[in-house]
């Protein structure tokens, strides 16, 4: 078998493009716009110029985007970059370049997490979407979805202690055991389904289906908890399901929250029809969560703790927006549909 030549690599990449390499759609992203925030979050003066130079921060950020797009572990990410020429092209790597190993990927993500960088990176991209007129603010949809975390095998007593905001005494005496325990995640039940982990509260632009804001909480927090924090003077109309009834809506914002029926006071036919009309728009946020669950291979966590959950869920929302942006730009002028 002959060696893989430069011409062979070029031919293979050309063929991948013909077959439809979905990662090429993300070339439209201005990756360099993230560099200032990435450098600020990772800036650390090198003690010596000896040894290998550090990896480029934008390339490492693109590794995290790849990882979230395909929902890969650190080890799987390292392997897939080495194995898949489409991944290498997306990262700007050749067969002769070093590939970040699993530990490097973990350390980079951990550094960004500790710096609280994901909120700024999300906002950075959001500003670009605003500037390009993709976020219209004509309609705003608010909803929340569960994000399951690795289930903990705790005793009932330990769970009660955690629920009270305390750490079981036995865990405090064993730091290694405590490091493997998630004291921030919570159990919750909805529609006969039980979940353990966190919630992604999202605010979505109705026209573009872009996420304009989000908040991360533990799973037991009510869906409507972040509602009032999301709304501002830019919003014209707000849509939400009946779980959000009774929440304060700023003056000037049209209330299109679905009405709720009560015992002894069911909804009238007119109210039911009104809810059906509102739901035609409100359902667009389900398309967002559906894309993440399907095209982005699931909305789950491998991490432990609220800080890592905030980073990973924030990254999920950012990567979704990148994918949605590439779709909108291919469609041309923005239309509702």
How should each PLM-predicted stretch be described?
Residues 1-34, 40, 328-337:
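Charged, often Cys/His-bearing segments associated with DNA-binding zinc-finger transcription factors
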Residues 24-65, 69, 104:
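Basic, short loop/linker segments at the boundary and entry of helix-turn-helix/winged-helix-like folds
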Residues 46-57, 71-110:
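Trp/Phe/Arg-rich N-terminal binding region typifying the photolyase-homology
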Residues 161-163, 236-237, 242-314:
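Helix-centered, glycine/charged polyanion-binding patches within enzymatic domains
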Residues 79-82, 92, 100-251, 258:
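Polybasic low-complexity intrinsically disordered regions
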Residues 47-52, 260-269, 332, 337:
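Arg/Lys-rich, glycine/proline-spaced intrinsically disordered segments
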Residues 157, 306-309, 315-317, 323, ...:
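C-terminal domain-tail junction helix/linker
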Residues 15, 51-59, 97-100, 277, ...:
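Secondary-structure capping and boundary motifs in well-ordered enzyme cores
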